[in-house]
Amino acid sequence: SGYLPGKEYVYKYKGKVF
């Protein structure tokens, strides 16, 4: 969250929330 809009979903999917 707050790192890269759009990529946040990818990180969240992999279990990593940036």
From Swiss-Prot:
GO CC annotations, alphabetized: extracellular region; membrane; other organism cell membrane
A GO BP annotation: killing of cells of another organism
UniProt keyword annotations, A-Z: Antibiotic, Antimicrobial, Fungicide, Membrane, Secreted, Target cell membrane, Target membrane
UniProt induction comment: Constitutively expressed.
Disulfide cysteine pairs (residue numbers): none
Compartment(s) of residence: Secreted; Target cell membrane
Function: Has antifungal activity against yeasts like C.albicans MDM8 (MIC=15-30 uM), C.albicans IOC 4558 (MIC=7.5-15 uM), C.tropicalis IOC 4560 (MIC=3.8-7.5 uM) and C.guilliermondii IOC 4557 (MIC=3.8-7.5 uM) but not against filamentous fungi like A.niger, C.herbarum ATCC26362 or P.farinosus IBC251. Has weak activity against the Gram-positive bacterium M.luteus A270 (MIC=60-120 uM) and against Gram-negative bacteria P.aeruginosa ATCC27853 (MIC=60-120 uM) and S.marcescens ATCC4112 (MIC=60-120 uM).
Protein name: Longipin
Organism: Acutisoma longipes (Neotropical harvestman)
